[in-house]
Amino acid sequence: MTDIWKPSVTVAAIIERDGRFLLVEEETSDGICFNQPAGHLDPDESLEQAVVRETLEETAHDFSPTALVGMYMSRYVSSRTSLEVTYLRFAFTGKLGAVHDRPLDQGILRTVWMSYAELIACQHRHRSPLVLKCVEDYLKGQRAPLSLLYTHPTAIGAMHA
């Protein structure tokens, strides 16, 4: 039997405050990069739960998603290993909540607030081209209701309880 190809599903939080966007500076196999708070969908969680968790882990902030900015697919090829991965990214916007006194996720160096102009100026340090694309879509007012996404209870662990 042939293996079935599967993309890597990720989530990202597009968080804007006073014309600036919340990013993380992180260590990657290709060097230090900027990214939105983002990460992989874990087993037994919804996409919304994943973006809440990733934002907390990477920024120490609570996050409440209010809309889906977009769904994006891109291919990443490591400059170091030539490994290819296709990502399917779900980008959310929402409300930033309380900050907690907790360490940031492993590999996250710090959080940074950047203007759109600053984001453009440092594109060479973006984790992927989707960092800028998601912000541009957000700035264009692109939003879809969260009701567009449906997670059946069997996908979030109800069958495992």
Q: Language-model segments: which ranges?
A:
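Unchanged
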Residues: L41-S64, R75-P129, H160-A161
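Residue-level recognition of beta-strand microenvironments
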Residues: L68-M71
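Short connector loops at helix/strand junctions that flank enzyme active sites
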Residues: S8, E16, Q36, F63, ...
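Generic structural signal for helix capping and beta-alpha/helix-loop junctions
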Residues: G31, M73-R75
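Conserved Nudix-box catalytic region and its N-terminal flanking loop in Nudix hydrolases
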Residues: R17-E57, P153
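Charged phosphate-binding loop/patch that engages nucleotide di/tri-phosphates or the phosphate backbone
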Residues: K133-A161
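Conserved N-terminal beta-strand and adjoining loop/helix that marks the start
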Residues: M1-L22, H40
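Residue-level signal for pocket-adjacent positions within structured domains
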Residues: I4, S29-G31, Q36, V99, ...
